[in-house]
Regions:
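Transmembrane alpha-helix entry/boundary detector in multi-pass membrane proteins
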Residues: 1-4, 24-39, 64-75
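N-terminal signal-anchor/start-transfer transmembrane helix
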Residues: 2-26
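Alpha-helical transmembrane spans of integral membrane proteins, capturing the lipid-embedded, hydrophobic core
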Residues: 6-7, 36-44, 76-80, 84, ...
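A generic, lipid-embedded transmembrane alpha helix
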Residues: 31-57
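Short alpha-helical packing/oligomerization segments
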Residues: 64-102
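Loop-to-transmembrane boundary segments
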Residues: 69-72, 111-135
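Juxtamembrane inter-helical linkers in multi-pass membrane proteins
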Residues: 96-115
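Juxtamembrane boundary at the C-terminal end of a transmembrane helix
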Residues: 133-147
């Protein structure tokens, strides 16, 4: 079961990292903040559901219910954080280039040509690093935890 959840969450993470939505509008930033609230609310709902399963149906112990509640909520928080990391990297880079366009106009053409030349490769490298981090996080969450 742990392998299944590892593969599912890693697949979701890779989809979120590589889906191409690297820049957010204000509406999408608000949605991202609401997703954090929903993840935290979902943690309580999942916790009560697993506790109910353990007490009424005796499917597993309360300790196992707490364990799975924790690792599922941590997995969703990791998904949220990974997408946030990719979007923040792209946003910070865009802000730096925008700053140079306004406040460093005499050198903006040089910087712009360099960023156009190396920017896509750096974005791919950053996404590869975040993907590797996702693999390490979900491996640690799902495959090294013992109940």
């Amino acid at each position: 079961m742990n392998w299944l959840f590892f593969i599912v969450f890693l697949g979701l993470a890779l989809f979120l990292i590589w889906n191409g939505k690297d820049r957010f509008s204000k509406k999408e930033w608000v949605r991202m903040a609401l997703m954090l609230g929903l993840i935290l609310l979902g943690t309580f709902i999942i916790g009560f559901f697993f506790k109910w399963l353990s007490l009424s149906l005796s499917m597993f112990s309360i300790a196992a219910a707490r364990h799975y509640t924790a690792i599922i909520s941590i997995s969703f928080l990791c998904l949220w954080g990974l997408k946030l990391a990719v979007v923040l990297l792209c946003t910070i880079f865009a802000w730096i280039i925008g700053f140079h366009e306004v406040h460093n106009a005499e050198n903006y053409q040089k910087i712009s040509s360099i960023s156009n030349k190396f920017g896509p490769g750096l974005l791919i490298a950053a996404k590869c690093l975040v993907s590797f981090g996702a693999f390490l996080m979900f491996y640690g969450i799902w495959l090294t935890a013992a109940v």
